[in-house]
Each structure stands twice: as structure tokens, then as C-alpha cells.
């Protein structure tokens, strides 16, 4: 049984389902599609998903789709609300209804207030949007060659990342070398997604010829 404070999603099949949903969230995917991808019966997968995620599989798909659309509304301001809704499988009226039901505001109003939502998020720790934009000027993008990693996908708020990293590095210290890279993937926007539903991944590169792989 999963410990109460354990944020790691341990089940391989659940991780496979989540990855599939993330990769195809802008397509018209169903629970049947996810189950087929995982080679599980629909009802068995639905039961496992709820046990591991405390959320119904269908609701997870719907939530991720709406929250990704909300993120697009924030960052792709040159695109219309209707265009973004259609990208995620909604007609104009259906998008507004589903969006309001989940986020308690209309897509149009959300876009207008998105900057304020960023600054109000507890994850922002009092940082203003101007400060965030200034920091963005110092960010560089580097393209890396494909690499082998050991990783853990976790669910929970981002406030304890330092402790999560310490535990992760200690757990996989036997796999580390002087060339090891540590990579963090924060998947959700905590100004949109409930903090306890946010996901992140901690990754550590591992040499392909490492003895542990033989």
C-alpha cells in the first residue's frame, strides 16, 4: 500500500497511461484508447488508476485537456479562444461551459486575468510578473542528445522539491558518476492546476554501459 506521504507514482502501467495521455491530450482519446495502449481491460485499468491517482481516469483526461488549454490561453495570446478550444476537441459553446465548470471562469475572462493569477499563486512566493519576465531574459535553451535516465514521476505540490531531490539523489547515488546530469521536469502550472494534483519528474542520467544495466 502506498504511504500517505509518498508522492511517487510507482505503477508502471499507470505511468504508461499518463504518458500516453500527455502525448495525445490534443487528440480525441478515450478511456478505451488508453486501455488498449496499456494492454489492459478498460475496467481493470480504471480501477488501478483510481487506486493510484485518487481520480477517475476519464476525469483525469478531461482535466488535463482543460488545463492544457488554459495554459495555451496564457502563453499563446495571438490565438483566439475558439481556435484553442477546437485544438482540444471542443466547440466554442462546449469549451466555454466545460472551462467554466472546471476553472470557475470563462476562457475569455481567464485570459484577461491570467497575469494576476500567476502573481497570486502561492508558488510565485511574492514574485511579480515583471521579475519573472526579467528572469526569463537570462534563460537559455540547450538541445541535448538522447540519453538514458532513471526517473521518478511524482504527484504533489512543488514546495518540497528540495527534499524530494535530496531523497532521489541519495536513492540512486550508486548509479551516479562525475558525468551525471540531474534533470527536473515540472509538468503543471500551479496557477492553473490544484497544487496537490501537480506532477513533476526527477531524472538522473545513467551511462548505457553501467554495470547495473547488465
Identify the residue ranges that each predicted region occupies:
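Basic, low-complexity segments
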Residues: 1-4, 32-53
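Short, Lys/Arg-enriched, Trp-marked, Pro/Gly-tolerant hinge/linker segments that flank
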Residues: 1-16, 55-56, 62-63
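Residue-level marker of regulatory loop/turn positions in helix-turn-helix DNA-binding domains and
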Residues: 6, 10, 23, 38, ...
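Short, N-terminal intrinsically disordered low-complexity segments that are rich in Pro/Gly
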Residues: 6-7, 28, 154, 158
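Basic, amphipathic alpha-helical hairpins
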Residues: 16-29, 49, 71-79, 99
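Small-residue (primarily alanine) positions within well-ordered alpha-helices
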Residues: 17, 35-38, 69, 85
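A solvent-exposed interaction/effector surface
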Residues: 43, 48, 55, 59, ...
